[in-house]
Amino acid sequence: MGCSISGLNALYDAATGGGDVWINERRFRVVRQIGEGGFAFVYLVRELQPQSDAALNRRASHDSEDGTYAIKKVLIQSKEQLDLVKEEIRVSSLFSHPNLLPLLDHAVIAVKGDWSHEAYLLFPVYMGGTLFDNANAMLSRKEFYPTADVLQIFRQLCEGLKHMHSYDPPYAHNDVKPGNVLITRHRGQAPIATLMDFGSARPARKEIRSRSEALQLQEWAAEHCSAPYRAPELWDCPSHADIDERTDIWSLGCTLYAIMYNVSPFEYALGESGGSLQLAIVNGQLKWPAGPNPPYPEELRQFVIWMLQPQPAMRPHIDDILLHVDKLITKY
């Protein structure tokens, strides 16, 4: 799916009082805002009756049965921001997997005012919130997922990531964290996990052959990879290094820890006198908080440690992780 740029195909028409959004031939009514961050706003919308055969033809297999969706609106102020949005659209179109959030439609339009363009990205809506939302709620209630749910959520996340790592060339998500994992719950079933936000995704393998290249990578990571989940080699990159998809494996280990304990594994350092998040991560200084009673199996803790190796070469690949998680699921 290419990036269409049209002044007519996407419009947030506040003047009419209807609060409607057009994306190509499809029209949506804004229900309410459900999120925001930076220059992006996320709205819950409901699709109005399709008006044309073209609109019907654009409908995808992921389209909502009840007509509700999420629309992400991005305000674009520079060519760099425009390029980033176009890249997010391009990368999102590469992947199709049940555990990766699909981009259903999009439009980028030129506008007048304080910014140059607006982008509208259409997604399925997941009202169960993110793992981060769930973790905060569970932390306040001192609740924990049972071991079986931990493993099922984590396995689904691994399946989505494997799809990206198996692409040719392999892609890294670069921002795996609880806030980018949507959760869907059905009564009597384990939660379903869906990985989202491909704005930081890039080809995973990169050769670093100078101090300048190492610093460029660190600067890029500081902007695009959330600090508590960022791999050590993205904090302090050697002048000669081969970066690969195992940066995601570190983030995956941090996320498994957060699924278990409702907190990230290294942010404890921020609450210590003289503590440093970077040093805790680079040195792999892991601490275990109080958990459920009875506690999680020691094998699950060792699974986390396996992924949180400061040296990338010591970390497993995604196929190894899936083999191991299946063994744990069989056991627990």
Positions of predicted regions on the chain:
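Short beta-strand micro-motifs within the conserved protein kinase catalytic domain, predominantly
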Residues: 102-117
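Catalytic-loop of the protein kinase fold
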Residues: 165-185
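Activation segment/activation loop of eukaryotic-type protein kinase catalytic domains
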Residues: 179-226
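Conserved short submotifs of the Hanks-type protein kinase catalytic core
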Residues: 114-130
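Protein kinase glycine-rich loop
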Residues: 31-38, 42
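Juxta-kinase regulatory segment immediately upstream of eukaryotic protein kinase catalytic domains
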Residues: 1-23, 31
